[in-house]
């Protein structure tokens, strides 16, 4: 996995709609809600603006702009139209490697770390060995949205992201994100905003070719 491959994507893959749980809802039921929300959202495009500040050499700070594409069940793509090419080439890979909650049970060994009635913390261990040792995911029990993700790598590095949501056409979608990446020889802070959503456009699979 590319060193800048996972963090921000964090969670547009978790584009989730709000719904109130019944009292005492179990973590399993919460995950079911997370996996089945936004039932009418089949695809979208949106405008992405991102700021990346590298805290290690070469200490670049870059503003990027592009179009974000999503198509069910798990296709994600960012095509940048402006920004520093070197940074953009890394950044557009972020969104291609995030799996939605509907696939968590298939791809990870899943356990519940804690549930205080407001927030549930999950641990996801990949069933297939790769660079990620495990993922810590935090979900809001009321809205069934992924609020934070942290990828913990075998090399001792990590990437983390916090999601902030808004409403679009009756769906809850990511409006902004903040995050951080620390890996050997590479440290960066990330912030992004996503707006201009167009819901359920006809998207060709060719857009996602090569991902």
Predicted regions and their residues:
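One face of beta-strands
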Residues: 44-50, 64-68, 74-80, 133-135, ...
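A short, amphipathic edge element
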Residues: 27-30, 100-111, 156-160
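An acidic-aromatic
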Residues: 53-115
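Short loop/turn positions at the edges of beta-strands in beta-sheet-rich folds
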Residues: 40, 70-72, 116, 143, ...
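Gly/Pro-enriched, hydrophobic low-complexity segments
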Residues: 118-210
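N-terminal leader/targeting segments and the immediate start of mature chains
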Residues: 15, 20-53
């Amino acid at each position: 996995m590319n060193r800048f491959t996972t963090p921000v994507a964090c969670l547009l893959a978790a584009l989730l709609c709000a719904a109130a749980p019944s009292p005492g809802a179990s973590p399993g039921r919460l995950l079911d809600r997370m996996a089945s929300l936004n039932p009418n959202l089949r695809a979208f495009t949106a405008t992405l603006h991102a700021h990346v500040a590298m805290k290690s050499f070469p200490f670049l700070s870059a503003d990027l702009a592009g179009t974000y594409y999503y198509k069910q069940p798990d296709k994600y793509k960012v095509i940048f139209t402006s920004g520093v090419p070197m940074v953009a080439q890394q950044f557009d890979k972020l969104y291609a490697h995030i799996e939605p909650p509907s696939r968590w049970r298939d791809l990870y060994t899943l356990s519940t770390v804690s549930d205080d009635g407001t927030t549930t913390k999950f641990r996801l261990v990949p069933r297939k060995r790769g660079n990620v040792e495990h993922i810590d995911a935090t979900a809001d029990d009321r809205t069934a949205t992924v609020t934070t993700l942290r990828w913990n790598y075998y090399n001792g590095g990590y990437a983390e992201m916090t999601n902030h949501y808004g409403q679009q056409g009756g769906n809850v979608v990511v409006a902004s994100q903040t995050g951080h990446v620390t890996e050997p020889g590479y440290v960066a802070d990330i912030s992004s905003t996503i707006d201009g959503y167009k819901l359920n456009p006809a998207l060709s699979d060719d857009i996602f070719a090569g991902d």
